[in-house]
Swiss-Prot record:
Gene source species: Methylococcus capsulatus (strain ATCC 33009 / NCIMB 11132 / Bath)
Organism lineage: Bacteria, Pseudomonadati, Pseudomonadota, Gammaproteobacteria, Methylococcales
A single Gene Ontology CC term: cytosolic large ribosomal subunit
Family: Belongs to the bacterial ribosomal protein bL17 family.
UniProt GO MF annotations: structural constituent of ribosome
Gene3D superfamilies: Ribosomal protein L17
Entry's Gene Ontology BP terms: translation
Keywords from the named record: Ribonucleoprotein, Ribosomal protein
Family annotation (PANTHER family): LARGE RIBOSOMAL SUBUNIT PROTEIN BL17M, RIBOSOMAL PROTEIN L17
Keyword Ribosomal protein: yes
Oligomer and partners: Part of the 50S ribosomal subunit. Contacts protein L32.
Protein's name according to its UniProt entry: Large ribosomal subunit protein bL17
InterPro entries: Ribosomal_bL17, Ribosomal_bL17_CS, Ribosomal_bL17_sf
Amino acid sequence: MRHRKAGRKFNLTSSHRAALYRNLAAALVEHEIIKTTLPKAKEIRRYVEPLITLSKEDSVAGRRLAFARLRNREAVTKLFNDLGPRFKTRPGGYTRILKCGFRAGDASPMAYVELVDRT
């Protein structure tokens, strides 16, 4: 039974799912807004918010933990040099999900995920 099991599977293997989260998170950090399906948007929020909290305090250990999750040097640099200081006083809730209709091909619900204080 699946009772109290958090997270979505997306019919993917665990390694494919981890790569999906890593790539979406790196894209969100880099571009500060991305368009994806609504379920993926809700999952990526669970993945990115702890990374931003980690980046509020710049340390080598924190950078290594973030790199282990993202595997993208540019994203980690932006996370700690730009996003961490920007969200220093905000106690969570760094992302916003905006629904934006349905995809033409398969009618999947689509959404924008953006960082709240986007420049």
